Amino acid sequence: MESTINIENVVASTKLADEFDLVKIESELEGAEYNKEKFPGLVYRVKSPKAAFLIFTSGKVVCTGAKNVEDVRTVITNMARTLKSIGFDNINLEPEIHVQNIVASADLKTDLNLNAIALGLGLENIEYEPEQFPGLVYRIKQPKVVVLIFSSGKLVVTGGKSPEECEEGVRIVRQQLENLGLL
């Protein structure tokens, strides 16, 4: 029984220009928010595909909230074109995009005994303090992901750089729990 993952969020970064005038962007883009006393970047949200941008004076851009890597590429390309259309001529229209983090969820569809899992997986790779947080934090070395395991059987995978790394994290957890007789 394979569990499928659902990508909840993709965070990616790129460099669209050598520098940006964030005050100009805020005045030209409806809905853009810039308050340098509160945060050094400009926040801009797009609806389709749904995502949010953090745009910095350095020309760097962080995109968050997309549900897949293809949407990240689409919204970053659209953002580059939009910035060019409002007068930023030095925009890189085909930027190199770096996925920084993917958050995914999965469901093993069974209740889990987190105390037994904590003992079985070994204390060097896990954090489990139920008084502090209801999930067990399991750090996997390869791929380098963190899997939050909940007693409901739900999993949250963070730190993946690709959907495949997130899927591999879930596969490893499932395999180890099966090997321990806990699934």
Curated annotation (Swiss-Prot):
Alphabetical GO biological process terms: DNA-templated transcription initiation
Pfam family name, one: TBP
UniProt repeat feature Sequence, residue ranges: 7-83, 99-177
Keyword annotations from UniProtKB, A to Z: DNA-binding, Repeat, Transcription, Transcription regulation
Any one Gene Ontology molecular-function term assigned to this protein's record: DNA binding
Family in the record: Belongs to the TBP family.
Function text: General factor that plays a role in the activation of archaeal genes transcribed by RNA polymerase. Binds specifically to the TATA box promoter element which lies close to the position of transcription initiation.
Protein name: TATA-box-binding protein
Species for this entry: Methanothrix thermoacetophila (strain DSM 6194 / JCM 14653 / NBRC 101360 / PT)
